[in-house]
């Protein structure tokens, strides 16, 4: 679920997904089009693609299980679909953490769809 995604971002990247990633570049936030603008935006693009491959459950609403082991997030549970959602969220949170030094809110916060032409979109 989106609430769990926020939790994973806080645990892994030590940032609020709502305040840092909900309206950034062309892909961080609801929907997405155009070219990813930087490494952080690419994290969101890959996350959107990952969600797009999930079938049989709702990535934004379904609750999954995870645990922390030696500082790492481990996705668990018996439902393979929910585990897949967790893996999408886990990978994005790690990507955000690994690209924190490249995050550029002055340039890409509230970037706007007008700067993300649909015709420049790339496939997943």
Swiss-Prot record:
Cofactor(s) needed by this chain: Ca(2+)
PROSITE patterns for this protein: PA2_ASP, PA2_HIS
Metal-binding as UniProt keyword: yes
TM annotation in the entry: none
Disulfide feature: 26-116, 28-44, 43-95, 49-124, 50-88, 57-81, 75-86
Any one of the GO CC terms: extracellular region
Function: Snake venom phospholipase A2 (PLA2) that acts in vivo as an anti-thrombotic agent. Inhibits platelet aggregation induced by ADP, arachidonic acid, and thrombin. PLA2 catalyzes the calcium-dependent hydrolysis of the 2-acyl groups in 3-sn-phosphoglycerides.
Similarity section: Belongs to the phospholipase A2 family. Group II subfamily. D49 sub-subfamily.
Protein name, per record: Acidic phospholipase A2
Organism annotation: Gloydius halys (Chinese water mocassin)
